[in-house]
């Protein structure tokens, strides 16, 4: 196994909260996949959830080498959790196609948040 891609991103939770205050659910609907939106609508701390998901999706797009461009969208990256709470990242759409063409077999994700910031790192492995 070899590392094919690595991406990291940090998001300012206060900044995301300001965007959320201006645009309401429109920002969430632009970046979240349908399964993530279900969770988002059930939460009180929506900005924190959005900031973490935004950081993950940016980190994943950097690991792919595309950014959010070349047909890759925020909704191509879907965050879920296993039964112990470990974050999992799955790819769909153009992101999945690119990952397959690059030989990606494993996707690793870690994310954290503290007061004002959310950070995520994604590793793509063969």
UniProtKB/Swiss-Prot annotation:
The catalytic activity of this protein is classed by the Enzyme Commission as 2.7.8.7
What's a GO biological-process term for it? fatty acid biosynthetic process
Provide the protein's localization.
Cytoplasm
Enzyme class comes to transferase
So which cofactors does this thing need?
Mg(2+)
The answer to keyword Hydrolase applying to this record is no
User: Per UniProt, what is one GO molecular function of this protein?
Assistant: magnesium ion binding
Its function, per the record, reads: Transfers the 4'-phosphopantetheine moiety from coenzyme A to a Ser of acyl-carrier-protein.
Name of the protein described by the UniProt record: Holo-[acyl-carrier-protein] synthase
Q: Which species is this UniProt entry from?
A: Photobacterium profundum (strain SS9)
